[in-house]
Amino acid sequence: MKRKNIALIPAAGIGARFGADKPKQYVEIGSKTVLEHTLGIFERHEGVDLTVVVVSPEDTFADKVQTAFPQVRVWKNGGQTRAETVRNGVAKLLETGLAAETDNILVHDAARCCLPSEALTRLIEQAGNAAEGGILAIPVADTLKRADGGNISATVERTSLWQAQTPQLFRAGLLHRALAAENLDGITDEASAVEKLGIHPLLVQGDARNLKLTQPQDAYIVRLLLDAV
């Protein structure tokens, strides 16, 4: 039986570091919001069977997304943190029967709207049948410094360091189990939750273009990348 690939986009955050008057996933770049650009990537990819967006219960922008993408499921059951939002989304996918425990969930940051299609394909091909799952990531290229106040305390050896990206792909049952803990403090991505179970996900080569819109100046680079598509 074919294993489904389901994209899950947690979009309940407020994007405080971005400094806009609305959550950063709803900031417009060109004629579309960041979230609409992101959803388009998954809706155009033939390897993705279903896309779900999980937003805050108080979200007032999601109706536009639903209008633009009527086939996308938009659920207003987001939590206070990313981990809670993903947990709620996975639980509902399983409860509604839209996902079986053996189906793949690809969790992707709403603010990574420049994900190249070939990177998504690579993740599905290399991690889609791996029981331990896998994530897109790129080797750390810059020299890293450990800080002590405002001074350098040490240079960090970067040989084995990778920078995590998204999507992060895991079986629905595994992800549900990994996020079942009552206290999700310190869980900054899905891989870190899975690692706490003693499982070591695959590292799949990501792409430098798959950057996350975090600071206001990132919008300039994102705009250039989107214009180049």
Curated annotation (Swiss-Prot):
Function, in words: Catalyzes the formation of 4-diphosphocytidyl-2-C-methyl-D-erythritol from CTP and 2-C-methyl-D-erythritol 4-phosphate (MEP).
Residues in the signal sequence: none
Pfam family, any one: IspD
Pathway where this protein functions: Isoprenoid biosynthesis; isopentenyl diphosphate biosynthesis via DXP pathway; isopentenyl diphosphate from 1-deoxy-D-xylulose 5-phosphate: step 2/6
EC number: 2.7.7.60
GO BP terms: isopentenyl diphosphate biosynthetic process, methylerythritol 4-phosphate pathway
Alphabetical UniProt keywords: Isoprene biosynthesis, Nucleotidyltransferase, Transferase
Site entry: Transition state stabilizer: R17, K24
Positions of the record's site feature: Positions MEP for the nucleophilic attack: R158, K212
Keyword set includes Transferase: yes
A Gene Ontology molecular function term of the record: 2-C-methyl-D-erythritol 4-phosphate cytidylyltransferase activity
Family matches, as InterPro entries: IspD, IspD/TarI, IspD/TarI_cytidylyltransf_bact, ISPD_synthase_CS, Nucleotide-diphossugar_trans
Sequence similarity: Belongs to the IspD/TarI cytidylyltransferase family. IspD subfamily.
Official protein name in the record: 2-C-methyl-D-erythritol 4-phosphate cytidylyltransferase
SUPFAM superfamilies: Nucleotide-diphospho-sugar transferases
Lineage: Bacteria, Pseudomonadati, Pseudomonadota, Betaproteobacteria, Neisseriales
Protein's UniProt keywords contain Cytoplasm: no
Catalytic activity: 2-C-methyl-D-erythritol 4-phosphate + CTP + H(+) = 4-CDP-2-C-methyl-D-erythritol + diphosphate
Top-level taxon of the source organism: Bacteria
